[in-house]
């Protein structure tokens, strides 16, 4: 588990952009019961989360069509919440960072770490905006 003082700024990047921090399995379950479209970002301390995933996700919110609900869990910190979120992303293997988009609790799109690595924040933002347009 990472120290809170290390991850606090990384969590804040998404929380300040309007994401709800889901720190318990119960919070994830309640979030997933919300009707409509939702997105959960599985945040992490890795370089690709800092360099492209979080900036790309934030930039994607500069769009006319967005998921109604935004949530985030943090790998290596909120273990039980992350495990619960990953139940909703099956059959995909565990991945962090990752971005999951849901409609009425059903997974409709999943961006795994290997789709994030080597791509710019702008590429991730553009991709997510196209996903939002399909919702």
UniProtKB/Swiss-Prot annotation:
This is Bacilliredoxin CHU_0972. NCBIfam families: YphP_YqiW. Belongs to the bacilliredoxin family. It holds the Pfam family Disulph_isomer. It comes from Cytophaga hutchinsonii (strain ATCC 33406 / DSM 1761 / CIP 103989 / NBRC 15051 / NCIMB 9469 / D465). GO terms for biological process: cell redox homeostasis.
């Amino acid at each position: 588990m990472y120290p809170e003082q290390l991850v606090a700024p990384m969590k804040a990047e998404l929380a300040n952009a309007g994401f709800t921090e889901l720190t318990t399995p119960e919070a994830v379950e309640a979030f997933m019961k919300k009707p409509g479209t939702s997105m959960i970002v599985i945040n992490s301390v890795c370089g690709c989360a800092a360099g492209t995933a979080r900036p790309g996700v934030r930039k994607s919110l500069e769009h006319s069509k967005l998921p109604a609900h935004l949530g985030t869990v943090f790998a290596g910190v909120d273990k039980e919440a992350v495990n619960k979120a990953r139940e909703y992303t099956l059959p995909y293997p565990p991945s962090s960072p990752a971005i999951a988009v849901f409609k009425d609790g059903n997974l409709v799109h999943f961006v795994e770490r290997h789709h994030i690595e080597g791509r710019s924040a702008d590429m991730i933002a553009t991709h997510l905006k196209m996903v939002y347009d399909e919702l």
